[in-house]
């Protein structure tokens, strides 16, 4: 802020002369911002239609002329900032819009997301586009990219990337578990970086696991089915990541070899593009819809794969320009989905260039060219076309090749519909769906990373044909059987999904290997273990994908080099079950017999499914018959090829993924294997159940993430310290389920018996497969069937494992590992449910009126802020909780709980206080986003849990904190502080780094007892324009600076301001004036002042009391919010502040004048209602009236001027109905005005009017000053000694009265030294009572001022 020349006059004059000063514009804007801080603020309530009950969020248009507000009535209102008129009502959301944002560069484009899971993009010129999340999960946050046609959507634990010209998002990334919900997304002003806020699993996992419906995976499945509309896509990405990881983990070279198989274009139509159910255009892209293109992953569907291959063939990348071109079309055109679809296929996405350029790096998960990813418009042809259009697709191809070269070959995931290339995630687990990628470079797995079991939906790998029920679409990369209608209904598809999910996990487990071993040796040998086969077959069958995908990928069904990639990916997630066979040191596809597993390394997977055979169809068929699908897959593959690739086996010895082929007989074995899976699982769908169980088990198997081999030896509940996070979660799940499912187990066990019988039968039918018991037996060894049942966890169960890098053993559960033993963990990590429950209880209790914001802040949930480089449009690896962490723990309530400055250099957010054991405290922290000190905490300020909204001013010099009401006890007040404004002044200065400026006050009706809370408070985007906030009462209030109350930025003003912001109730001595509320004080004060001035008769004595303590005792007060403890910040209106400032100035001036013996003491405004006369409250309480009695013909102003000129003031104190007058020189009753008056001491600026105040000058005398408050202030400011007649009293009396009203409060607050009642009360009738202790200070002047003019004051009036 320090600039060479801060003189605005010089800058402006130089500008007129044409001189250009570097930074002059910014300097002027800063001056404006600083200047307005001293101005009086005027609030304007916007008249909104329908009188909404609550206002949630505010967003400003790029031209700074419009503000959008979301309301509980499900509407969004667009208001003109300058006029305060509501211009548009956006109606259509079925539930409350929780977030809203304007496009930063396209005028008139607004995006909103509601609690019903609907995202709408509105063109204010007409038209809108909408997309629904799967299962209608609430939309937590939205963010437009400033330059690309890209909208980021945060919902649940997923981050979707949507080009709204398409029917649904083209990419999705997931966190490592469902507990790690994404709460906020934000681009920096240039779109170079992306900020994400994600729940720290450690905070909630233990306590919130219970929140997860752990009923069973079935529940999840059913839910998924019910959510059919919601595309499985996001789950698919998880799989994709998983697959990527696998393939990348496996020798990339093999993947390269295989990845290259030409993708076949066919199937594009069947593939649902991205699988996001486009509610509006599903028909348009039925096939394409099947294509799911995730984040930087290419669509896995055959079409996409084919197109990718084409792309590869046509390496031409989309032009960066294309990529940069965001279709900025605003208006309906931007929203016409169909055209956009075609257009999308035609036009490269903003991201295409990135991908085409970087596609080769498997490390980068870039967004495939948006358009490329999903040529929605054209189905097969579009894919075919896409290659040309979307050379970026080449990226996928190159990824495959380069990735392989890198050893991270992108995995060409064969969705049933086709092969998709999935670039290996940049970080194994981070980008996609949580697939916590396990790195299997050696075939050894680190702890498995789980996406939550719930991920299962998406788990059906594209390769998986879980969608079989659903034709090609289901298989396409994101498609999950559950999402497919057919699939949904088809338990097989469900279990396929589950299996896919589980398979990832299982792959990690030796157990699977053991299961395989029973047939495992065979498997490797060429016979699939029943378990393996089952897993693979069920998964594979469901997803003929791996085989057929590979084949489809190949186009031949012959082993394509890609298959390994596909398979590894699919295998892992879909293929289920690559199991690592320690004996063979290979990852083997469980359930598949790999006759030549070793012989055919990953690259050679000949997918049994005919290449580009409609894998979807095969998948569908298989899906239809859960039992059949393993067989079918095997059969189909065997039929297609003598050997069907059962799966990839990772050969640790060779360090490569090897294809395992299933013998034609595999089908039977697979069936048996499936049976094997099912037999023990008491789930409705044995597969589902077994999968659930296995998923849990699998997470448990590698109890020691570092020692898979020993995992089987571990007890079911091994030492948590040895558990990988996934295993740990699984263990907890199992425990939880064991508690919850006792009833469930009975029915499940019955089912299990039935399943076992049926499976036994199937086994007998398929002797070739290893007895299911054997395969299950391995698991059985680890756990008993009952346990297994318990293990079953819903897909949604929070089994997610932290990303690979995060291994947090016991800290979740064991208090000894917690940072502190307090009830409230800063990080909320405690595994003790009591912590969260206590927090919730306290939150509810402290809120009183049910402010959820406060409750959530008291609760121990915290979020991590991660800062992602988005310059290359790389997908953020949000599944990795350890990378790019900017703020490890913070509090997020809504999109207003975090703010990035307009210049992109500062980030303001609330963080938990240090571990004090109580969550009732938080800290406002401002971090640097500058590259040289990224993440450095510059400013801090302590607040309570009611601080929920933060906004940085346009110039980044001030920060406003919005406050939710948390008070339990209410008292009437006309002014309610809803926000506080601070100045950022000293980096690294601790609590002094931020200085309190003023309070934002919400005017309330005196009879309103409901406290007001702010949901969102924002600075208007233009410097000096003001601010706006939305309240829980439905108000949208715009506050603007209207005029200056003081002549300059006088430091005294600042102090005064703070003084006057003190709570009206004087805290001096901690005594509260009896019975008067601030609102009452204000009214009485104003009336008293007016009466005193003679402007209007007053029947009752004014209730304003003022003390004349010479020393202003500045009291730090929490401005009604527990948060503020600095200088008193009053919840009084800003205008009050201004007045107070003025009064302060006068006071200070008066101090100056004190030097002038003749100056009257600053008079303390005091008019107090009789009740307030209590000396306990104030030493002197008087109703001050103008010097002359109201009856005099002289008007009040001239009277005041005359009195001031005379060097003494006469004050009329009215009590009851009697009026007494005291001259400045004579102190009546103990009105004490100390000779030494500090700036803030005289609350009434008016005091300055008098000549130097006599030490004993009664506050009452000050009354006249009070009346003149403003004039006095002016005079004080302008002239020298208050005594000087020259002091102008320019301010209107009304203003004075306002000031006076303020000053009494201030006085009482400021003057800590009030004379004891008795002392002050003994008025000396004709003379000053120096005895007044405060007066004593002024003795020297007091005599001189004691004019016997003062009238006899009735003792009773001031009597002790």
From Swiss-Prot:
Any idea which UniProt keywords this protein has? Answer: Autophagy, Cell cycle, Cell junction, Cytoplasm, Cytoplasmic vesicle, Cytoskeleton, Endoplasmic reticulum, Mitochondrion, Nucleus, Repeat, Ubl conjugation pathway, WD repeat
| Signal peptide stretch | none
Could you confirm whether the keyword Cytoplasm appears in this record?
yes
Q: Which Pfam families match?
A: WD40
Q: Name one GO biological process term.
A: chordate embryonic development
Output the Gene Ontology cellular-component terms.
autophagosome; Cul4-RING E3 ubiquitin ligase complex; cytoplasmic vesicle; cytoskeleton; cytosol; endoplasmic reticulum; focal adhesion; intracellular membrane-bounded organelle
**Disruption-associated phenotype:** Morpholino knockdown of ambra1a and ambra1b results in reduced autophagy and increased apoptosis during embryogenesis. Morpholino knockdown of ambra1a and ambra1b results in impaired locomotion, caused by abnormal myogenesis.
Show where the record puts the motif TQT motif 2: 1121-1123
Q: Which SMART domains match?
A: WD40
Q: Where is this region: Disordered?
A: 249-277, 315-364, 412-490, 514-573, 587-616, 664-688, 754-796, 1120-1142, 1241-1360
Compartment(s) where it occurs, according to its Swiss-Prot or TrEMBL record: Endoplasmic reticulum; Cytoplasm, Cytoskeleton; Cytoplasmic vesicle, Autophagosome; Mitochondrion
Question: What role does it play?
Answer: Substrate-recognition component of a DCX (DDB1-CUL4-X-box) E3 ubiquitin-protein ligase complex involved in cell cycle control and autophagy. The DCX(AMBRA1) complex specifically mediates the polyubiquitination of target proteins. Acts as an upstream master regulator of the transition from G1 to S cell phase: ambra1b specifically recognizes and binds phosphorylated cyclin-D (ccnd1, ccnd2 and ccnd3), leading to cyclin-D ubiquitination by the DCX(AMBRA1) complex and subsequent degradation.
Q: How does it assemble?
A: Component of the DCX(AMBRA1) E3 ubiquitin ligase complex.
The record's family statement is:
Belongs to the WD repeat AMBRA1 family.
Q: What is this protein called?
A: Activating molecule in BECN1-regulated autophagy protein 1B
| Species the sequence originates in | Danio rerio (Zebrafish)
Protein encoded by which gene: ambra1b
């Amino acid at each position: 802020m320090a600039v060479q020349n801060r003189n605005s006059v010089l800058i402006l004059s130089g500008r007129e002369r044409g001189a250009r000063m570097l930074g002059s514009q910014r300097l002027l804007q800063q001056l404006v911002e600083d200047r307005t801080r001293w101005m009086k603020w005027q609030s304007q309530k916007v008249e909104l239609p329908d009188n909404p009950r609550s206002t949630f969020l505010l967003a400003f248009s790029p031209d700074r002329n419009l503000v959008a507000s979301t309301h509980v009535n499900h509407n969004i209102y667009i208001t003109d900032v300058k006029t305060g008129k509501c211009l548009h009502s956006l109606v259509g959301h079925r539930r409350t819009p929780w977030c809203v944002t304007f496009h930063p560069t396209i005028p008139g484009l607004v995006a909103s997301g509601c609690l019903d899971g609907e995202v709408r993009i509105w063109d204010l010129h007409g038209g809108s586009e909408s997309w629904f999340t799967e299962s209608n999960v609430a939309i937590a946050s939205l963010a437009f990219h400033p330059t690309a046609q890209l909208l980021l959507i945060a919902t649940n634990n997923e981050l979707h990337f949507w080009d709204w010209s398409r029917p649904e998002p083209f990419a999705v990334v997931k966190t490592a578990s469902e507990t790690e919900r994404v709460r906020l997304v934000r681009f920096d002003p240039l779109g170079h970086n992306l900020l994400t806020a994600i729940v720290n699993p450690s905070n909630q996992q233990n306590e919130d696991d219970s929140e997860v419906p752990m009923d069973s995976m079935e529940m999840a499945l059913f839910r998924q089915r019910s959510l059919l509309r919601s595309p499985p896509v996001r789950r698919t990405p998880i799989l994709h990541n998983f697959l990527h990881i696998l393939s990348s983990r496996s020798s990339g070279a093999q993947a390269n070899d295989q990845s290259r198989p030409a993708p076949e274009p066919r199937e594009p139509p069947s593939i649902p593009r991205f699988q996001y159910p486009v509610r509006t255009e599903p028909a348009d892209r039925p096939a394409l819809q099947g294509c799911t293109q995730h984040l930087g992953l290419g669509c896995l569907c055959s079409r996409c794969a084919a197109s990718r291959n084409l792309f590869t063939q046509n390496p031409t990348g989309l032009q960066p320009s294309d990529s940069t071109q965001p279709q900025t079309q605003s208006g309906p055109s931007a929203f016409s989905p169909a055209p956009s679809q075609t257009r999308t296929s035609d036009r490269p996405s903003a991201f295409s260039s990135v991908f085409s350029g970087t596609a080769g790096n498997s490390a980068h998960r870039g967004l495939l060219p948006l358009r490329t990813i999903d040529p929605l418009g054209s189905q097969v042809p579009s894919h075919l076309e896409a290659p040309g259009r979307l050379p970026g697709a080449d990226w996928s191809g190159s990824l495959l090749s380069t990735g392989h070269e890198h050893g991270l070959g992108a995995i060409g995931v064969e969705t049933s519909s086709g092969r998709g290339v999935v670039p290996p995630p940049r970080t194994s687990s981070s980008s996609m769906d949580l697939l916590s990628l396990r790195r299997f470079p050696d075939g050894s797995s680190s702890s498995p990373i789980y996406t939550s079991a719930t991920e299962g939906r998406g788990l059906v790998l594209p390769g998986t044909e879980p969608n079989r029920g659903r034709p090609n679409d289901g298989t396409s990369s994101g498609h999950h059987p559950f999402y497919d209608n057919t699939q949904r209904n088809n338990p097989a598809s469900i279990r396929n999904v589950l299996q896919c999910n589980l398979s990832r996990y299982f792959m990690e487990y030796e157990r699977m290997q053991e299961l395989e071993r029973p047939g495992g040796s065979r498997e490797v040998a060429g016979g699939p273990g029943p378990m393996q086969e089952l897993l693979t077959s069920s998964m594979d069958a469901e997803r003929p994908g791996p085989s057929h995908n590979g084949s489809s990928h190949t186009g031949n069904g012959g082993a394509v080099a890609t298959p390994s990639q596909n398979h590894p990916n699919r295998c892992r997630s879909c293929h289920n079950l690559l199991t690592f066979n320690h004996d063979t040191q290979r990852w083997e596809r469980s359930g598949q017999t790999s006759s030549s597993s070793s012989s055919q390394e990953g690259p050679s997977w000949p997918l049994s499914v005919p290449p580009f055979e409609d894998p979807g169809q095969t998948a569908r068929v298989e899906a239809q018959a859960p039992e059949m699908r393993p067989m079918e897959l095997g059969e189909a593959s065997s039929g297609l090829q003598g050997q069907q690739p059962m799966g990839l086996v990772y050969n640790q010895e060779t360090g490569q993924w090897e294809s395992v082929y299933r013998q034609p007989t595999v089908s039977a074995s697979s069936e048996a294997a499936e049976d094997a899976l099912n037999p023990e699982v008491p789930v409705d769908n044995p597969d589902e159940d077994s999968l659930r169980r296995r998923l849990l088990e699998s997470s448990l198997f590698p109890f020691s993430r570092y020692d898979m081999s020993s995992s089987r030896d571990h007890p079911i509940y091994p030492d948590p310290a040895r558990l990988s996070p996934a295993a740990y979660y699984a263990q907890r799940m199992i425990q939880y389920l064991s508690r919850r499912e006792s009833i469930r187990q009975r029915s499940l066990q019955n089912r299990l018996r039935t399943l076992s019988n049926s499976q036994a039968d199937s086994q007998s039918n398929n002797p070739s497969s290893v007895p299911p018991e054997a395969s299950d037996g391995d698991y059985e060894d680890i756990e008993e069937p009952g346990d297994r049942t318990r293990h079953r966890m819903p897909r949604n169960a929070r089994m997610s494992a932290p990303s690979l890098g995060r291994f947090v053993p016991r800290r979740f559960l064991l208090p000894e590992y917690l940072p502190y033993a307090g009830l409230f963990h800063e990080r909320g990590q405690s595994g003790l449910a009591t912590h969260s429950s206590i927090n919730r209880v306290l939150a509810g209790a402290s809120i009183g009126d049910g402010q959820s914001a406060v409750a959530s802040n008291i609760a121990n949930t915290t979020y991590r802020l991660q800062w992602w480089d988005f310059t290359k449009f790389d997908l953020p690896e949000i599944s990795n909780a350890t990378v790019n962490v900017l703020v490890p723990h913070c509090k997020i309530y809504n999109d207003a709980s975090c703010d990035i400055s307009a210049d992109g250099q500062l980030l303001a957010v609330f963080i938990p206080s240090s571990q004090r054991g109580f969550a009732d405290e938080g800290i406002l922290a401002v971090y640097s986003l500058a590259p040289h000190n990224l993440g450095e905490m510059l400013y801090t300020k302590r607040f309570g849990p009611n601080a929920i909204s933060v906004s940085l001013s346009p110039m980044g010099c001030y920060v406003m904190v919005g406050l939710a009401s948390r008070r339990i006890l209410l008292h009437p007040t006309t002014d309610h502080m809803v926000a506080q404004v601070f100045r950022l002044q000293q980096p690294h200065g601790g609590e002094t780094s931020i200085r309190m400026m003023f309070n934002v006050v919400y005017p309330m009706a005196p009879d309103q007892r409901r406290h007001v809370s702010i949901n969102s408070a924002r600075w208007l985007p233009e410097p000096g324009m003001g601010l706006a906030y939305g309240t829980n009462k439905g108000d949208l209030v715009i506050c603007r600076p209207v005029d200056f109350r003081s002549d300059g930025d006088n430091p005294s003003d600042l102090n005064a301001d703070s003084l006057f912001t003190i709570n009206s109730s004087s805290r001096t001595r901690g005594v509260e004036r009896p019975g008067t509320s601030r609102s009452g004080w204000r009214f009485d004060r104003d009336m008293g002042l007016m009466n005193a001035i003679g402007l209007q008769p007053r029947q009752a004595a004014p209730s304003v009391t003022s003390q004349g303590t010479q020393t202003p005792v500045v009291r730090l007060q929490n401005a009604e919010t527990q948060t503020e403890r600095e200088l008193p910040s009053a919840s009084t209106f800003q205008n009050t502040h201004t007045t107070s400032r003025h009064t302060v100035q006068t006071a200070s001036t008066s101090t100056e004048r004190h030097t002038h013996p003749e100056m009257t003491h600053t008079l303390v405004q005091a008019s107090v209602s009789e009740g307030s006369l209590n000396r306990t409250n104030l030493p002197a309480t008087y109703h001050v009236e103008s010097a002359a009695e109201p009856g005099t013909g002289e008007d009040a102003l001239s009277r005041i001027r005359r009195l001031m000129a005379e060097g003494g003031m006469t004050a009329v104190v009215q009590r009851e109905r009697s009026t007494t007058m005291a001259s400045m020189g004579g102190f009546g009753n103990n009105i004490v005005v100390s000779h030494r008056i500090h700036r803030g001491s005289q609350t009434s600026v008016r005091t300055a009017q008098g000549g130097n105040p006599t030490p004993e000058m009664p506050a009452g005398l000050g009354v006249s000053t009070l009346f003149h408050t403003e004039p006095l202030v002016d005079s004080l400011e302008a002239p020298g000694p208050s005594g000087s007649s020259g002091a102008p009293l320019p301010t209107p009396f009304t203003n004075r009265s306002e000031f006076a009203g303020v000053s009494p409060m201030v006085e009482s607050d400021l003057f800590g030294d009030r004379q004891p009642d008795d002392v002050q009360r003994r008025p000396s009738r004709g003379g000053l009572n120096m005895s007044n202790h405060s007066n004593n200070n002024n003795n020297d002047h007091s005599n001189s001022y004691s004019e016997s003019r003062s009238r006899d004051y009735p003792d009773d009036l001031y009597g002790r």
